[in-house]
């Protein structure tokens, strides 16, 4: 701090997307209750995901969707997400809404999720009530259901990036780690509850008779859980709005020269001025005038500059994205086909047999048991997430990352080699280890990278090189993009492998092989901050 006759230091607290010559200020400590409230978004999201996993195939079959359109349903959403995630991530970095940068996007995507569920779970019933012509009814039912599935998948995949960026914006480094563990914990709880409710035969219960069909029952529960969870999430931690440092000079933003409050939201773009009665107020204004063009150029991000920021991201970010892609490719390869694997390989059923045949009924039984296996996965994911907090102090993030990939690779390998009912259900717990790992460790590493960069920025002279337009939203979105890319790879390539091999056992073998390759990658190429 300078004396009373010198210029006042002007501290600008900005995200990684902007020049931050004096570093960033640590956020205040958040209570466990606030972090749990923040994590409810993951509970609601995963609950709805589980309902979709249990019901989307029966819904698509019931409306008569042609097999030729199946691939379009499953590929359209991840393709859209892969293309748009970084754009929206960058837009949220520069959002100037009064109630924050991330929450407007989270609210919009939650509404889109609700609309998507309403369309794919109720579309057929609505069309049946409004359209009499059988041909038009078929066309409208298929169209509305497809739109609903794509809209829900797109929104549910998309929303993870803004939720993580919101957590990173409002929490200290220690609270980020705790928050990510709570996210994984409630992700498991939400998935388990969704799978359990999806396994109940609602048709023969009073609620099923009251609402009409099991599809309407599940929409009722899904809408209720989603609305309550996201209201809780959006009210969890106050988010400071982005101030316009390019149009509001420091003297206007804080005419009294007061520092930011402790509760305060050391927000992106805000100004702190040191209390000093003899400070020269002309100096900060002059500095603001000199920096104004730079600030404007930083906030204006074209598609070209965004792509350049992603292409030129540091190598350790790229390696983390590749490892995330490998992990999700292995995980989705197994999860998307697991119930079919249980029905065909473990139970030796026939999905193409007559619906009243013994082989088909055996297949259905295998699918039901497979759903319970996925429930075991969700429960164990929550349990493992709880113990992760203790384990990280002993084996570090590298050990957690490596162990998650290794256990999943070994577990799926044993399932493929020895397809027994009981051993398969026990080994479903390894899916939970991988799920928890994918939801926590990569984002913990992103938080570590951000903290390291902020420390380096604090040691640089003013006017040093910036991060080429990259912000926390862009980094989280780039990581989340890998989930969509993995879906594209799995949806486009795994069916081809199954057709070539003539058996779905190739699915779990592929998942095992990819995961073990990922073990080597996370050990050799991913950078870990000491």
From Swiss-Prot:
<feature type="transmembrane region" description="Helical; Name=3">
    <location>
        <begin position="106"/>
        <end position="126"/>
    </location>
</feature>
<feature type="transmembrane region" description="Helical; Name=1">
    <location>
        <begin position="46"/>
        <end position="66"/>
    </location>
</feature>
<keyword id="KW-0812">Transmembrane</keyword>
<dbReference type="GO" id="GO:0007601">
    <property type="term" value="P:visual perception"/>
</dbReference>
<dbReference type="InterPro" id="IPR036259">
    <property type="entry name" value="MFS_trans_sf"/>
</dbReference>
<feature type="transmembrane region" description="Helical; Name=8">
    <location>
        <begin position="367"/>
        <end position="387"/>
    </location>
</feature>
<feature type="topological domain" description="Extracellular">
    <location>
        <begin position="127"/>
        <end position="138"/>
    </location>
</feature>
<keyword id="KW-0472">Membrane</keyword>
<feature type="transmembrane region" description="Helical; Name=4">
    <location>
        <begin position="139"/>
        <end position="159"/>
    </location>
</feature>
<feature type="topological domain" description="Cytoplasmic">
    <location>
        <begin position="238"/>
        <end position="318"/>
    </location>
</feature>
<feature type="topological domain" description="Cytoplasmic">
    <location>
        <begin position="388"/>
        <end position="398"/>
    </location>
</feature>
<keyword id="KW-0813">Transport</keyword>
<feature type="transmembrane region" description="Helical; Name=7">
    <location>
        <begin position="319"/>
        <end position="339"/>
    </location>
</feature>
<feature type="topological domain" description="Extracellular">
    <location>
        <begin position="420"/>
        <end position="425"/>
    </location>
</feature>
<dbReference type="GO" id="GO:0008506">
    <property type="term" value="F:sucrose:proton symporter activity"/>
</dbReference>
<protein>
    <recommendedName>
        <fullName>Membrane-associated transporter protein</fullName>
    </recommendedName>
</protein>
<keyword id="KW-0769">Symport</keyword>
<dbReference type="Pfam" id="PF07690">
    <property type="entry name" value="MFS_1"/>
</dbReference>
<dbReference type="GO" id="GO:0006583">
    <property type="term" value="P:melanin biosynthetic process from tyrosine"/>
</dbReference>
<feature type="transmembrane region" description="Helical; Name=12">
    <location>
        <begin position="505"/>
        <end position="525"/>
    </location>
</feature>
<keyword id="KW-0470">Melanin biosynthesis</keyword>
<feature type="transmembrane region" description="Helical; Name=10">
    <location>
        <begin position="426"/>
        <end position="446"/>
    </location>
</feature>
<feature type="topological domain" description="Extracellular">
    <location>
        <begin position="67"/>
        <end position="68"/>
    </location>
</feature>
<keyword id="KW-0716">Sensory transduction</keyword>
<feature type="topological domain" description="Extracellular">
    <location>
        <begin position="340"/>
        <end position="366"/>
    </location>
</feature>
<dbReference type="GO" id="GO:0015770">
    <property type="term" value="P:sucrose transport"/>
</dbReference>
<comment type="similarity">
    <text>Belongs to the glycoside-pentoside-hexuronide (GPH) cation symporter transporter (TC 2.A.2) family.</text>
</comment>
<comment type="subunit">
    <text>Interacts with TYRP1.</text>
</comment>
<feature type="topological domain" description="Cytoplasmic">
    <location>
        <begin position="1"/>
        <end position="45"/>
    </location>
</feature>
<feature type="topological domain" description="Extracellular">
    <location>
        <begin position="206"/>
        <end position="216"/>
    </location>
</feature>
<feature type="glycosylation site" description="N-linked (GlcNAc...) asparagine">
    <location>
        <position position="356"/>
    </location>
</feature>
<feature type="transmembrane region" description="Helical; Name=2">
    <location>
        <begin position="69"/>
        <end position="89"/>
    </location>
</feature>
<keyword id="KW-0325">Glycoprotein</keyword>
<feature type="region of interest" description="Disordered">
    <location>
        <begin position="275"/>
        <end position="299"/>
    </location>
</feature>
<dbReference type="GO" id="GO:0033162">
    <property type="term" value="C:melanosome membrane"/>
</dbReference>
<feature type="transmembrane region" description="Helical; Name=6">
    <location>
        <begin position="217"/>
        <end position="237"/>
    </location>
</feature>
<dbReference type="GO" id="GO:0048066">
    <property type="term" value="P:developmental pigmentation"/>
</dbReference>
<keyword id="KW-0225">Disease variant</keyword>
<feature type="topological domain" description="Extracellular">
    <location>
        <begin position="499"/>
        <end position="504"/>
    </location>
</feature>
<feature type="transmembrane region" description="Helical; Name=5">
    <location>
        <begin position="185"/>
        <end position="205"/>
    </location>
</feature>
<comment type="function">
    <text>Proton-associated glucose and sucrose transporter. May be able to transport also fructose. Expressed at a late melanosome maturation stage where functions as a proton/glucose exporter which increase lumenal pH by decreasing glycolysis. Regulates melanogenesis by maintaining melanosome neutralization that is initially initiated by transient OCA2 and required for a proper function of the tyrosinase TYR.</text>
</comment>
<feature type="transmembrane region" description="Helical; Name=11">
    <location>
        <begin position="478"/>
        <end position="498"/>
    </location>
</feature>
């Amino acid at each position: 701090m300078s004396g009373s006759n010198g210029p006042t230091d002007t501290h600008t607290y900005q995200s990684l997307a902007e020049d931050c010559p004096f570093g960033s200020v640590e956020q205040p400590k958040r209570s466990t209750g606030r972090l749990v409230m923040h994590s409810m978004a993951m509970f609601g999201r995963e609950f709805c995901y589980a309902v979709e996993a249990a019901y989307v195939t029966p819904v698509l079959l019931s409306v008569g969707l042609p097999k030729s359109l199946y691939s379009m349903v499953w590929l359209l959403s991840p393709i859209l997400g892969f293309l748009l995630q970084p754009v929206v991530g960058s837009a949220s970095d520069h959002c100037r809404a009064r109630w924050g940068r991330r929450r407007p996007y989270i609210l919009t995507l939650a509404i889109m999720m609700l609309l998507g569920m309403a369309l794919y779970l109720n579309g057929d019933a609505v069309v049946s009530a409004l359209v009499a012509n059988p041909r038009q009814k078929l066309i409208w039912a298929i169209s509305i259901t497809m739109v609903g599935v794509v809209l829900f998948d797109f929104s549910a995949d998309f929303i993870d990036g803004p939720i993580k960026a919101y957590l990173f914006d409002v929490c200290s480094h220690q609270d980020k780690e705790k928050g990510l563990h709570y996210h994984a914990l409630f992700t498991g709880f939400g998935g388990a509850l969704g799978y359990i409710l999806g396994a109940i035969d609602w048709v023969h219960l009073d609620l099923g008779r009251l609402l009409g069909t099991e599809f309407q029952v599940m929409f009722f529960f899904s809408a209720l859980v989603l609305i309550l969870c996201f209201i809780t999430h959006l009210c969890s931690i106050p988010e400071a709005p982005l101030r316009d440092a390019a149009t509001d000079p420091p003297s206007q933003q804080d005419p009294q020269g007061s520092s930011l409050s402790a509760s305060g939201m050391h927000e992106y773009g805000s100004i702190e001025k040191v209390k000093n009665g003899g400070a020269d107020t002309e100096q900060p204004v002059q500095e603001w005038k000199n920096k104004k063009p730079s600030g404007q150029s930083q906030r204006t991000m074209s598609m070209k500059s965004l792509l350049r920021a992603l292409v030129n991201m540091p190598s350790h970010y790229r390696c983390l994205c590749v490892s995330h892609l490998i992990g999700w490719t292995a995980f989705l390869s197994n999860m998307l086909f697991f119930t079919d694997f249980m029905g065909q390989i473990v139970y030796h059923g026939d999905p193409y047999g007559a619906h009243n045949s013994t082989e088909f009924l055996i297949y259905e039984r295998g699918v039901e048991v497979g759903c319970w296996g996925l429930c075991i996965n969700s429960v164990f994911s929550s349990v493992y997430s709880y113990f992760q907090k203790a384990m990280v102090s002993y084996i570090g993030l590298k050990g957690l990352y490596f162990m998650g990939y290794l256990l999943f690779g070994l577990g799926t390998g044993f399932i493929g080699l020895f397809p027994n009912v009981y051993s398969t259900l026990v080994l479903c717990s390894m899916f939970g280890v991988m799920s928890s790992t994918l939801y926590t460790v990569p984002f913990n590493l992103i938080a570590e990278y951000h903290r390291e960069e902020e420390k380096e920025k604090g040691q640089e002279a003013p006017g040093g090189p910036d991060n080429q337009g990259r912000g926390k939203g862009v980094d989280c979105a780039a990581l989340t993009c890998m989930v969509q890319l993995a879906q594209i790879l799995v949806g486009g390539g795994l069916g081809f492998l199954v057709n070539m091999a003539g058996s779905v056992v190739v699915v779990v073998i592929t998942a095992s092989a990819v995961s073990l390759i990922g073990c080597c990658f996370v050990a050799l190429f991913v950078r870990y901050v000491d």
